[in-house]
Swiss-Prot record:
The gene is sibD. This is Integrin beta-like protein D. Pfam families: Ig_SibA (PF24619), Ig_SIBA-E_2nd (PF24908), Ig_SIBA-E_3rd (PF24910), SIBA-E_N (PF24907), vWA_SIBA-E (PF24909). It is found in: Membrane. Keywords: Cell adhesion, Coiled coil, Disulfide bond, EGF-like domain, Glycoprotein, Membrane, Signal, Transmembrane, Transmembrane helix.
Length: 1957
């Protein structure tokens, strides 16, 4: 319910950051747009020194926190994930990938931002830019003028954190970079330039990025390179280069080819070799990458997201013997997998990556390092991560990606469809009351709306206010605190007191006590001050007795100006020293009574108080307060001590404190003590804490629990009471629970503020209380729209700042003619007007039929306690939708031979009668054909066909021309309105009525009968539409003897003796004679007694009358008499069985006839005149007399022709029977004939209903054709033609693209994909037709085979329903006390944005809306709603003065929110939305720190400027505007465990961002002080909200400065040398000498007595004497432990003489420290002189044997030279060098080649190196080993002549002081003569001198090669150090040969090489 508090606290905590710094090595970042033009993904790569961040070695995937500035006033913190950790070189790399959304732009606009990462500081050991700021930045281009695929991306680069380069050689490498978003056909055009960091001598090719660099120094450089693409986007690459010495060898073209070298300049005379930027003279063997498999730097490795790959291999090898290579990928993304394939001198790894995420997309430039443990090499790799053409397995079809399920083609299958998330695009979980984090980068989590919690946001964390009681919402308990809770949040339900329980825990001894001494240094006398100072340690001891292990101290002073100055924050161990250094300031009478304000200032100052410590300040003023202190000062003092929970203890020394006493009593807390003895005040300190009676409550401050509240607390009105004071007098642990802290809700309170208050105990801590209470809810107005005659579902909405569960009640309702609103249970809300509905209730709005006006209802919100102050409206907008016409079914009755008129009945809401048409093409053709069998259908005089257009108001005529039996003929039809919209199917039924026809009595029948008693006769009547008949005998003429009679039951048998005969007379009637098979027969009898034939003897005439009274014709039956005769019955001829086809009208003619053996007829010419009678008609058909006629065949004269007609549709068998009767009524037998009715194939039928769908229908509904076939055959339908603009699909969803096309399952659907491309008018209706042809699958072939319906036209109708406009919840940001012309977000696919309007439902509460063009028009309730609409850009919002988000309940805003809908030109509303106004407070940050600071003279002062957020502020930044500049002001950077690094501010203004606390350091100028010494002027700002200008005055407090000691010079007395200035602190003297040392002392303070100098510690060796100029040896008294003072000489200097112990030497032989002391006993810093007593190097010697120094031999014979020894008196334990060579006997010293003479001797222990070309051997070794080697020297000459053996010895200067060793080499040279004679038997033609001269000349050319041997030998002989002997080892007295010349660059090792003996 109160979660906003947590948010706010977190927000504030997040702002409290600290300025930290570390040793950064490398950095760069790239950027690229994501799925939105202004959503930019950044990839930041950084490298740091590991130990600056981690105490233990970190691992990959560990992280650190970094802050990044996006350049739009947004700074965010992210995790930098470690990607590479190098434990050897102490660095790591990390990558952070994050996204940022920049402000939106209008279409077509662009914007640029400079994003950057900045950090202090670079490392101090850099050769350039040391301690400089580190900043990498990039120009980020936001582009809303291009499609996403054309928006620019930044370049990308990379580097190793420390790039290895070789000192003194060319180091050429490329800055690897890629233009990562080149489009097809483009080429990279990157430009490379240096940033502000550039090593001296480094050059850069701006087009290629090639770097040329020859380091001139060994160490670390930094370089910054700016890489810019052709669009102006740039990135920064910043890295370190490490210049190291590498051993190498000179190029073969150099004179010293193969010689060991370290830099190019070591190689000389390299001939034609040009070593410039690309070639080196000094070469090294390095490891090398093997190409392939290693990709070359200009090659790219491509990976495709989601696709498998094999990665790539990297291989490296080395030729160095015994070394293996190691390959290290640097900074590769976390997903890379490294597999080691090969280890050894050659190493191979595989780098594999399966990128799966869209985040991986882009280009990477990474480095790989190979090392063989001696030398590192690098290579760069460019990696491109591509999106697949269609990601996630999709494929492209006609330019569109067809994606797997749940992926969208709009993103080329890279993103999920709505409602799916993650890389596999699975469905998001249920999210009931929130928004799911969907999309491929989403995590599927449900982010809950306010008031809901749980994974699916289904659990309400709200409750009704009515169920709430006052109580604790949350509390914070701190176990170590004396008072708990330390923080509490309380909900106040009413104005009843609510008690808060307080727990007090006081341990046996207070665990933590902090005591801060505030001492006034303006004591009357120095003695008083010294007494305070002397007792301070004792006072500490007394307090420590209270809690021996846990007391901390601090110290502040009231200075000579009466101002507070903090000398030592808590905890400090040096408060006594701090006060000693401060000294007494001297009495200042002007500061009387200022201790109260100084104490207040001290209480407000951050002094380092520890959390959970008892806090006390001991105030020792010089004077009492004024008699009547200013009340405001007392209040300020009281509130400051209450707010910080500090217990004041005031101690007066020799002064009355009555006014202090009354002030403490007025405050209600504290203690005071008076001491008449300045030395005894220490005793009162402890009692002030315990056992004192001089306190407000009579006991010590530690024993009082005193509750107080700051008078300025904002929530004071909510506080009803605080606990009473609690005395604690027990020494054991006390735990008590206190009551008395109570709160209540004031009757009148500001409902928009939740105030806080702090209740404190004095010393023991505070309770921070946050109050909450209920606020009225607010109903949210909104609008909904629905289509005409459609429903809309809605829920009521409201907001509540307290997150209460809301219910709602309607306050107005709809009328029955407007519409109906029902609940989810179907209840009309107007029937329960006082019902409260839950917020989850769903209502259904149903407008009255065809109601189109706008409607609204009102409702209020209720939170269980309070009802909203006002109601809100729900506005209903009904979208007019063209309604289809409605047709009606009807029946029309027709009569035979009559004409009837009728109309198709239809109505339409929009159209009048003239516009409503009915098209006969919508009448089923088979129905029309059926009707035409019975009559004629005409319209306006013309026959109705399927092409007839019928208007509603014109009658249709039907004349029934046939008189069938009653039947109904349907006409199925549809109506169509003027828009082409069709109705549903209706039926107009034609009731074909049968008109009754009179029966037919059989007429003209003659019967010939013999004389008999009774002959049967039948009177016949035929009638097809009657059930019975009445036979009426019209006339009877029975002849003379005849009688016609009948029987009573109409069934006479005409046999004799019938007793029921009734004679027939005229007008006799017979009724209820039934028709059977359309025939009715009245049997009668005729009897006569005539003996002879009489023609026309009798007759009977009759009629038959049907059921309806129609009388037939008059029929007469004539009786001929033939008298007595016999008669033979006739024989009937059988008709053979035959067959006919189904539904054919008549068969062929058939005849009933027979034969008669006698002549029956009275008239002979009529002999055999038989009567044929159908005795049993067929059951499934009829017999007719005339083909295609309608007269039923019953009987007739034979031969009787008839035709068989089967009943419609019947197939099978049928039969009929027949006989013939002769004239005597003799009947033949009855025969029957069977007819086979053969089935035929009938034409199938299809009915196509009008297919209707709308723009809101979504995918088309599948429609199935209505087919039928009389024969039961399958009907197969095909599409013959397709509609235009509308796409047709089969029932599988496959589009039908070509015709004819069979329809599977005879089903289809339609879609119209994009209404914007409808022609000629987009977003309009489309009416079109298609045609279907259906065939059956009959197997019949005769008389007809397969039949079709023919092409039947179908109609498809797409009706475009105006789409509601859209809008989004949006937010407008502005600043407090400003206004903004804003735009509503609205769009409509049918309309131009300029045509859209805004319908407002509500107005802002805390601001106003006005028209932008006329600010005087302020909107009121009367000007909104209804027909009042506004343009999207028409309004301006202005918040009330001083109002901002800070004035909302949770301070987070928004300040205002209004509801609205967008209205399109057709009046359709969008769903309602809200626009909120986030009014950023213009409350600037606040500085609450000191405006005056006191700085000790010559002391660095750490100045922390802390700012508080202004109300509603977001950040605190600082801008130092100016600094007066007498001292130095620096930004102080925390370097972690390395302490602080101060960086001097050189330019103003100086700005810092991203923290709330900023560290500076102030350093006063040396030895200057004074009040108002410097001024610091600054502002705090929050983005563009700027505070007032703050000033900090710096007072530099004078502190007695220690004097300074200065070492001036020295003079070696024994040598009468001149005075030598002491450079640094070192003096060099020789063994057995003495030295005079001169020192000087100075003091910046004014001294009244001279300074005193002393030797503070006597040296361990040697003696020190004072100087006595009158003594012959200058020695005065010895300076020893008895007296270490040095007498001051008359010239103002002090002199001492140092004499080392006889015969002893050594570096750092003695250390003599000097100090001077001023009159106040302040001692200077020690100045120590270091004395080196050096030995004296002695000359080495060479001894040639005394016998002879000439040796004679012969050519090619060995001469042994002996008796040569060498000696160096002072080379006992160190080596010396020896060169033995043979030169000619002239004065020259050119060494002879081996081709002339050879030289050798035993090489025992020494390290010797014979030259390969010359007679020369170089050795280094001890005297003993060298003498052993040259005891015998062998010489063999191949040419006779005179030679000299030359020996050169160098003592290497080891016996000289190390500092002058290079200049102290001593050497000696000796010669031995050698004469080589030719053999005696040999004749020599050439002069020896000539030969020898030639040989020598030839050898001269190779003299330079000697150096190679010398270097190699010396190199191998060098001690194992980081340097080596150079040619200085051979310096001597030989100068004629170049090989003996002194090197100008000689140097030697600082480590003595031990002799090898």
């Amino acid at each position: 319910m109160f979660s906003f508090v947590v948010k706010l606290l977190f927000f504030i905590y997040f702002l409290i950051t600290f300025s930290n710094a570390s040793h950064i090595r490398f950095g760069t970042f790239k950027w690229q747009p994501t799925t939105q033009y202004n959503e930019i993904q950044f990839t930041l790569d950084l490298g740091f020194r590991t130990s600056a961040w981690f105490s233990n070695l970190p691992q990959k995937n560990d992280f650190i926190k970094i802050s990044f500035n996006f350049g739009d006033n947004v700074v965010s913190t992210y995790q930098l994930i470690l990607t590479t950790v190098d434990s050897k070189d102490d660095w790591f790399t990390g990558t952070s990938v994050f996204s940022h959304t920049y402000p939106t732009l209008e279409v077509g606009k662009t914007a640029n931002y400079t994003a950057f990462y900045s950090l202090c500081c670079r490392i101090s050991t850099l050769l350039n830019e040391k301690d400089g700021d580190f900043t990498i930045k990039s120009l980020v281009q936001i582009d809303n003028s291009n499609s996403l695929d054309k928006i620019n991306w930044s370049p990308v680069s990379g580097m190793v954190p420390i790039y290895p380069v070789t000192y003194g050689r060319n180091n050429n490498f490329n800055i690897p970079a890629s233009d990562q978003h080149l489009r097809p056909g483009e080429y990279s055009n990157l430009v490379f330039t240096f940033g502000e960091a550039k090593p001296d001598g480094m050059t850069l090719d701006k087009n290629t990025g090639m770097v040329y660099f020859m380091p001139s120094s060994v160490g670390l450089y930094c370089a910054k390179v700016i890489i810019t693409d052709k669009n102006g986007a740039y990135i920064t690459l910043d890295f370190i280069l490490q210049s190291e010495i590498q051993n190498g060898f000179c190029h073969h073209q150099c004179n010293n080819s193969g010689e060991i070298c370290t830099k190019n300049s070591d190689c000389i005379n390299c001939g034609n070799l040009v070593y410039n930027k690309t070639q080196d003279a000094c070469l090294s063997t390095k490891p090398i990458f093997i190409y392939p498999p290693t990709p070359k730097p200009n090659q790219t490795q491509t990976f495709v997201i989601g696709e498998q790959n094999e990665g790539f291999n990297v291989s490296c090898t080395t030729d160095a013997i015994g070394l293996n290579t190691t390959i290290q990928p640097v900074g590769f993304p976390i997903g890379f997998i490294t597999k080691i394939l090969e280890i050894g001198p050659k190493s191979t790894i595989n780098l594999l990556w399966f990128p799966t995420s869209f985040q991986d997309y882009g280009t990477y430039v990474k480095y790989i390092v190979c090392t063989d443990s001696l030398i590192k090499i690098t290579t760069s790799i460019e990696i491109i991560i591509k999106k697949p053409d269609c990601s996630n397995g999709g494929f492209r079809d006609k330019g569109i990606c067809v994606c797997p399920k749940n992926f969208t083609s709009e993103s080329d299958c890279l993103d999920c469809s709505k409602g799916y998330y993650g890389e596999k695009c699975i469905a998001v979980p249920l999210c009931v009351n929130g928004v799911s984090n969907s999309g491929i980068l989403g995590d599927g989590k449900c982010y809950c709306n306010n008031g809901w919690i749980g994974d699916d946001c289904s659990i309400s964390n709200s409750q009704s206010c009515g169920s709430l009681k006052s109580g604790v919402v949350s509390s914070s308990i701190m176990e170590q605190s004396y008072i708990n809770p330390v923080g509490i949040q309380v909900y106040l339900a009413n104005n009843q007191k609510y008690q808060i329980q307080v727990n007090i825990k006081i341990p046996e001894k207070n665990k933590l006590i902090d005591v801060y001494f505030l001492i006034d240094i303006n004591q009357n006398t120095q003695n008083e001050f010294n007494n305070i100072l002397s007792q301070l340690n004792d006072a500490k001891t007394k307090i420590l007795e209270l809690s021996p292990e846990s007391v901390s101290f601090g110290l502040g002073i009231i200075d000579e100006n009466g101002l507070f100055a903090d000398l030592a924050k808590i905890p400090s161990d040096s408060i006594v020293t701090s006060l000693e250094n401060k000294k007494w300031s001297g009495y200042n009478h002007t500061i009387t009574g200022k201790s109260l304000s100084a104490a207040t200032k001290a209480a407000k100052t951050p002094l380092g108080w520890r959390t959970n410590a008892f806090k006390s300040m001991i105030i020792i003023p010089r004077t009492d307060l004024p008699l009547s202190p200013i009340q405001t000062e007392i209040d300020e003092f009281k509130n400051a001590f209450i707010e910080k929970s500090i217990a004041p203890v005031v101690i007066g020394i020799n002064v009355s404190l009555s006014n202090w006493n009354s002030t403490l009593y007025q405050c209600g807390f504290g203690a005071y003590k008076l001491s008449s003895d300045a030395q005894g005040w220490k005793n009162f300190v402890k009692t002030a804490f315990k056992e004192t009676s001089s306190s407000v409550l009579g006991n010590g401050v530690l024993q009082n629990i005193i509750f107080k509240v700051n008078d300025n607390s904002g929530g004071l009105a909510f506080l009803k009471s605080i606990p009473e004071n609690l005395p604690i007098d027990a020494d054991i642990e006390v735990v008590k629970t206190l009551s008395g802290l109570s709160l209540s809700l004031p009757i009148n309170y500001n409902s928009s503020i939740n105030p806080s208050l702090r209740v404190c105990t004095i010393g023991y801590g505070c309770i921070d209380i946050k109050t909450n209470y209920n606020h009225p809810p607010t109903p949210n107005p909104f609008g909904i729209s629905c289509n005409q005659n459609s429903d809309a579902i809605f829920q009521l909405e409201g907001s509540d700042p307290d997150r209460n569960i809301l219910t709602f009640k309607f306050t107005s309702f709809l009328s029955s003619t407007e519409g109906l609103i029902k609940t989810s249970k179907g209840i009309d809300v107007s029937t329960q007007k006082d019902e409260l509905y839950a917020g989850s209730e769903k209502f259904t709005f149903s407008p009255y039929k065809n109601y189109l006006k706008s409607l609204y209802i009102s409702f209020i919100a209720d939170d269980g306690c309070l009802t909203s102050d006002s109601s809100a409206k729900v506005s209903f907008s009904i979208n007019k939708v063209n309604q289809p016409p409605e047709c009606s079914s009807a029946i029309v009755i027709s009569e035979f031979e009559k004409t009837v008129d009728f109309s198709f009945t239809a109505t339409d809401f929009e159209d009048d009668d003239q516009l409503l048409i009915l098209n006969a093409q919508f009448i089923v053709s088979s129905e029309l054909a059926s009707l035409e069998q019975y009559g004629q259908l005409t319209y306006i005089g013309a026959k109705v066909t399927i092409d007839t257009i019928i208007k509603k108001s014109v009658k249709i005529l039907f004349k029934q021309t046939k008189n069938p039996l009653n039947l109904l003929v349907p006409l199925t039809f549809k109506s169509k309105d003027s828009s082409g919209l069709f109705s549903n199917l209706c039926t107009q039924t034609i009731n074909i009525t049968h008109t009754n026809e009179a029966p037919i009595s059989n007429d003209g029948t003659s019967v010939t009968i013999p004389r008999s008693i009774g002959n049967p006769l039948s009177l016949l009547s035929t009638d097809i539409d009657s059930k019975s008949a009445i036979f009426t005998i019209k006339k009877v003429n029975a002849g003379k003897t005849g009688t016609f009679y009948s029987c009573t039951d109409n069934s006479c048998s005409c046999v004799a003796g019938s007793n029921d005969r009734i004679d027939i007379t005229d007008n006799t009637k017979y009724s209820q004679i039934q028709y059977a098979k359309n025939q009715a027969s009245l049997p009668i009898c005729f009897t006569n007694s005539e003996p002879s034939a009489v023609p026309n003897y009798a007759f009977i005439s009759f009629t038959s009358t049907d059921d309806e009274g129609l009388e037939s014709n008059l029929a007469t039956v004539i009786v001929n008499i033939v008298g007595y005769r016999t008669n033979v019955a006739p024989v009937v001829n059988k008709i053979q069985d035959y067959s006919v086809y189904q539904d054919y009208l008549d068969s062929d003619a058939h005849v009933v006839t027979g034969t008669d053996a006698d002549i029956d007829d009275y008239n002979p010419q009529n002999a055999n005149n038989l009567i044929a009678i159908i005795t049993n008609p067929p059951s499934n058909g009829i017999l007719v007399t005339v083909q295609n006629g309608s007269s039923i065949a019953i009987q007739g004269n034979a031969p009787f022709t008839h035709y068989y007609r089967p009943n419609p549709g019947y197939a099978g068998t049928d039969s009929y029977s027949y006989q013939v009767i002769d004239t005597f009524n003799a009947k033949s037998s009855i025969e029957s004939t069977t007819i086979t009715i053969k089935p035929i194939n009938h034409k199938p039928n299809v009915l196509i209903d009008v297919y209707k769908f709308t723009s809101e229908s979504g995918d088309g509904v599948i429609e199935t054709l209505n087919t039928s076939d009389q024969d039961g055959d399958n009907v197969i339908c095909s599409v013959i033609s397709l509609p235009k603009q509308i796409l047709m699909y089969d029932d599988k969803g496959v589009q039908i693209k070509s015709v004819p096309m069979v329809l599977p399952n005879n089903a289809y659907s339609f879609k119209l994909l994009d209404p914007s491309i409808i022609t000629p008018t987009p977003f309009s209706n489309v009416l079109s037709t298609f045609s279907i042809n259906c065939v059956d699958d009959s197997e019949k072939t005769t008389p007809k085979g397969v039949l079709s319906t023919g092409d039947v036209i179908g109609n498809v109708q797409y009706y475009y329903i105006n789409t509601p406009p859209k809008t989004n919840i949006s937010s407008v940001k502005l600043s407090q006390d400003s206004f903004i012309a804003f735009s509503f977000e609205g769009s409509d696919i049918e309309s131009n944005e300029k045509l859209l309007k805004v319908l407002l439902y509500s107005l802002p509460i805390n601001g106003k809306l006005s028209k932008s063009i006329d600010s005087n028009v302020v909107l009121t309730k009367e000007l909104i709603g209804g027909d009042n609409t506004f343009g999207l850009d028409e309004l301006t919002y202005t918040p009330l003065p001083g109002q901002s988000n800070w004035d909302t309940v949770d301070h987070l805003g928004p300040l205002d929110r209004i509801s609205y809908s967008i209205v399109d030109p057709q009046g359709l509303l969008s769903p309602s939305s809200t626009i909120s106004f986030q009014v950023r407070s213009r409350n600037p940050p606040i500085y609450l720190g000191d405006s005056d600071i006191s700085v000790l003279q010559n002391t660095r002062f750490p100045l922390t400027i802390e700012g508080e957020l202004g109300g509603g502020g977001l950040s605190v930044s600082i801008r130092v505007l100016s600094f007066s500049g007498r001292g130095n002001l620096s930004i102080s950077h925390s370097m972690g465990k390395e302490g602080f690094f101060d960086k001097l501010i050189t330019e103003y203004p100086s700005q810092q961002l991203g923290s709330t606390s900023y560290n500076f350091a102030y350093n006063p100028p040396r030895n200057q002080f004074g009040s108002n010494f410097d001024q610091i002027q600054f502002i705090l700002f929050d983005n563009d909200i700027i505070s007032k200008i703050y000033n900090i005055t710096v007072n530099v407090i004078h502190v007695n400065q220690p004097p300074a000691t200065e070492l001036i010079s020295y003079r070696i007395l024994n040598q009468f040398e001149k005075e030598i200035q002491i450079d640094g602190s070192t003096i060099n003297m020789n063994v057995n000498d003495s030295v005079l040392i001169k020192i000087y002392g100075s003091d910046i303070d004014n001294q009244t007595v001279p300074l005193v100098a002393l030797v503070s510690n006597l040296p361990l060796r040697g003696l020190i004497y004072s100087f006595d100029d009158n003594s012959s040896d200058y020695l005065g008294r010895e300076i020893n432990h008895t007296s270490q003072l040095i007498p001051l000489n008359e010239d103002g200097y002090w002199y001492v003489i140092f004499i080392p112990t006889k015969g002893t030497t050594g570096d750092n032989y003695a250390r003599v420290p000097f100090n001077v002391i001023d009159e106040k006993g302040v001692v200077s810093q020690t100045s120590t002189v270091i004395i080196n007593v050096n030995s004296v190097n002695l000359q080495p010697k060479i001894y040639i044997g005394s016998n002879s120094n000439t040796f004679v031999g012969k050519v090619n014979l060995t001469i042994s030279i002996t008796n040569i020894t060498l000696d160096d008196p002072d080379s006992v334990n160190n080596n010396i060098s020896l060169i033995v060579s043979i030169v000619d006997d002239n004065d020259g010293d050119e060494v002879l080649p081996l081709s002339i003479i050879k030289l050798s001797f035993t090489q025992a222990t020494p390290k010797c190196n014979p030259n390969l070309n010359l007679a020369l051997i170089t050795c280094i070794g001890s005297k003993k080993s060298l003498n052993a080697s040259i005891s015998t020297i062998s010489v063999i000459g191949s040419i006779s002549g005179k030679y000299r053996l030359k020996l050169f010895i160098d003592d290497l200067g080891y016996s000289a002081p190390s500092t002058v060793r290079a200049e102290s080499h001593l050497n000696a040279t000796g010669y031995v003569n050698i004469i080589i004679n030719d053999p005696i038997a040999t004749t020599q033609n050439t002069d020896n001198k000539t030969v020898l001269s030639g040989a020598i000349a030839g050898a001269s050319a190779g003299a330079a090669l000697l150096v190679i041997g010398l270097w190699k030998m010396i190199k191998r002989s060098s001690p194992p150090t980081d340097t080596f002997f150079d040619e200085g080892a051979f310096m001597g007295d030989v100068s004629s040969s170049p090989i003996y010349e002194k090197s100008e660059t000689s140097y030697v090792s600082r480590i003595y090489e031990g002799a090898d003996d």
